[in-house]
């Protein structure tokens, strides 16, 4: 394999839109010898991030996947990376693209990242390139907490402090770059700035150019606006409601209230 591209986020830098476009064009990309792993139905390879926890730890994703012990995590790791190895062997791609913001936001230690690299190499990956989009920490906090409000969480002023546990690990850009370059090498880091004032099409164009994909290789109509933020007025109203009621949390699954506020 000529190249393995790990797109590691950050959270709130348009990852969902990128992943959706890649997943919808998987067959088209294979014709150009570019593999987008079929493991992730949404295009988000978060399973590989969770499988790289070293050591095992419990969080919302491990609970959702019913990974309750180190032994279960080890079995999960083997299944996930064996499946990736089988995909690589079946398609013999020149390039593999793996995308998940959870690579950055969940793999916080050198041991985690080393485990990811080791497992990927055993699956047949090589020639790594780490692609990360950095964004103004305050903008990340605002977007992150806006999503939390839509899920029924009451956000207070303390949430916007950089040391708050919901965002501290995401906005510490220096630590992120130090950790990933320590494992994969400075020369393999591709650090870019999120195009803050531009539309999603600018981000998509930048991503495709960076990973070496021509737009002519894709069906660009297979795009979707994802994770649209509510207006400031709507968010404030919703946040005040969250302070007094769990109604929003209960409605979050069908998004009825969000549609009324947007």
What do the predicted segments below correspond to?
Residues 1-262:
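Anion-recognition interface
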């Amino acid at each position: 394999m000529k190249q393995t591209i790990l797109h590691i986020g950050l959270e709130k830098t348009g990852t969902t839109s990128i992943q959706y476009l890649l997943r919808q064009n998987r067959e088209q990309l294979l014709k150009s010898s570019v593999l987008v792993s079929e493991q992730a139905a949404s295009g988000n390879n978060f399973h590989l991030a969770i499988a790289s926890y070293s050591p095992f730890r419990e969080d919302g994703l491990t609970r959702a996947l019913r990974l309750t012990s180190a032994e279960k995590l080890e079995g999960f790791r083997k299944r996930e990376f064996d499946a990736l190895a089988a995909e690589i062997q079946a398609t013999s791609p020149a390039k593999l693209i793996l995308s998940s913001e959870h690579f950055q936001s969940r793999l916080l230690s050198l041991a985690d990242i080393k485990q990811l690299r080791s497992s990927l190499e055993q699956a047949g990956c090589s020639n790594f390139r780490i692609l990360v989009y950095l964004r103004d920490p305050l903008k990340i906090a605002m977007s992150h907490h806006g999503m939390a409000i839509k899920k029924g969480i009451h956000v207070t002023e303390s949430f916007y402090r950089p040391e708050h546990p919901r965002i501290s690990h995401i906005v510490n850009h220096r630590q992120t770059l130090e950790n990933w370059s320590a494992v994969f090498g400075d020369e393999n880091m591709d650090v870019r700035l999120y195009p803050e004032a531009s539309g999603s099409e600018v981000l998509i164009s930048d991503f495709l150019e960076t990973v070496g994909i021509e737009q002519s290789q894709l069906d660009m109509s297979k795009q979707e606006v994802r994770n649209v933020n509510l207006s400031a007025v709507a968010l404030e109203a919703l946040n005040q409601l969250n302070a007094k009621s769990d109604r929003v949390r209960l409605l979050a699954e069908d998004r009825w209230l969000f549609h009324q506020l947007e």
